[in-house]
Curated annotation (Swiss-Prot):
Region Disordered, residue ranges: 1-37, 102-132
Bias type Low complexity, positions: 106-121
Compartments reported by the entry: Cytoplasm
Primary location group: cytoplasm
Protein name in the entry: Uncharacterized protein C9orf50
Length: 431
């Protein structure tokens, strides 16, 4: 093979051959010398006892004298580390949290003094990992410079809470009843209040409304099942039709002297029934809907009673007209009966009634009594039941002629009749 001649003074480089050549073996790194098993075991043991440790477990994973699992024959199986208890785990977490929290706030001069010392000209700067390990507050100080002041105050408060003694893990009362028992208004430790709604965190307006409801509903609910300490006895008397004096309702509170079964918190519950999957807002809404329906039913009953009362009033007027003396006029009673019989028919409009009233007034002023009687006999008798209203009773009184009304007033009638016919006496003055 032809080789080019090198210049004088140039560096002589060995030619690179193929991977299988011997030149490649000479150019590669020299291998480490092979160690015997006893020497290897000694080296690994020295490294395990020194800096080489398993995080979290340390050298406790393997028995003393063992370098690694699989080295040596006939060794004991590896031992697992002991499980951490709840208290050790809490202490470990607390220590980790303290290392993450920033140090307390200091002034500018103090912060400069507490800052890590700068290495001198002859000293060597330590790596950051070793600084963080030796100084646990390094990370906290670094975070304190970056975080805002409010968040630092929150972290300080959290650090103070962590510094306090830990609460006992076991408590006599279950955790789901603890929140209810702490805020129970009656007694601080009442095991019978678990069904009450937890009002902690609710708005003040809702709490005030619930207290008002409880005060209103406590005497109405009466004795609850299984509560023998406080109960209300109410005696109700039947209504007597002959006007006998009805005795008043009497309520007497009797207390049980033995004191067994005392449940002071149950009477403050505003609701008798609360479902398991129902929230406090749903219970309140259901209660108010029920109360609203009761109020609406009372209003409807009052409206339905108004026409009944008007019918009673006009029925009494008809009876008084029937009781008029026959000696006044021979046809007066017939006319009053004819006018009263028109109330039991159906279908009379407002325009027709006004026309009839105008006919009555014109006839009373111009025609004699006999012509008015004939016109009244020819008049169709239709209903005034649609106008049986307390505001229209004065218009219905004008159906009678003025002469008959004046004669009735002269003879003398009951006081109530004067009041009903007062408008009829004022009509001639207006004309």
């Amino acid at each position: 093979m032809f080789w080019r001649r090198l210049r004088p003074g140039a560096q002589d480089l060995a030619p690179k051959g193929l991977p299988g050549d011997g030149d490649f073996r000479r150019s590669s790194d020299p291998r480490l010398p092979k160690l015997t098993p006893p020497a290897l075991r000694a080296a690994l043991g020295a490294r395990g006892s020194g800096d080489w440790r398993i995080p979290g477990g340390g050298a406790a994973w393997w028995p003393e004298g063992d370098a690694k699992p699989g080295v040596g024959v006939g060794r004991l199986p590896p031992r697992l580390p002991a499980l951490l208890t709840a208290t050790r785990r809490a202490v470990r977490k607390r220590g980790l949290l303290r290392s993450l929290l920033p140090p307390p706030l200091l002034s500018a001069g103090a912060s400069r003094e507490s800052a890590p010392r700068q290495p001198g000209p002859g000293e060597r700067e330590r790596p950051r990992r070793r600084v963080a390990r030796e100084d646990p507050d390094f990370l906290g100080a670094f975070l304190g410079e970056l975080l805002p002041s409010r968040f630092r105050e929150f972290l300080h408060q959290l650090q103070e809470k962590c510094a306090e003694e830990p609460e006992p893990l076991t408590s006599p009362a279950p955790q789901h009843q603890r929140g209810v028992l702490e805020h129970c208004p009656g007694s601080p430790r009442c095991p019978n209040c678990s069904f009450l709604p937890d009002l902690w965190g609710q708005s003040s307006h809702l709490q005030d409304s619930l207290t008002k409801i409880s005060l209103q509903q406590t005497p109405i609910l009466g004795p609850l099942k299984g509560d023998h300490s406080q109960f209300t006895t109410v005696r109700k008397a039947n209504h007597r039709p002959h006007g006998a004096q009805v005795p008043r309702l009497k309520a007497a509170l009797t207390h049980n002297p033995s004191g067994e079964g005392s449940r002071p918190c149950r009477q403050r519950c505003p609701f008798r029934v609360r479902f398991a999957d129902e929230t406090l807002q749903d219970t309140t809404l259901r209660y108010w809907e029920r109360r609203r329906s009761v109020q609406q039913s009372v209003i409807v009953n009052q409206k339905a009673a108004l026409p009944v009362a008007s019918e009673r009033v006009f029925g009494s007027v008809g009876k008084r007209l029937e009781s008029l003396p026959k000696a006044l006029y021979p046809g007066a009673k017939e006319e009053t009966l004819a006018s009263s019989s028109c109330w039991d028919c159906a279908g009379l409009s407002t325009q027709k009634t006004q026309g009839y009233l105008s006919e009555d007034t014109s006839m009373n002023s111009s025609l004699p009594f006999c012509s008015w009687k004939k016109a009244a006999a020819q008049r169709p008798r239709s209903s005034l039941r649609a106008f049986l209203d307390p505001h229209r009773n004065l218009e219905q009184e004008s159906l009678l002629p003025n002469r008959v009304l004046q004669s009735v007033l002269k003879q003398g009638c009951p006081k109530g009749y004067h009041l009903l016919l007062a408008s009829a006496t004022l009509q001639p003055d207006k004309r």
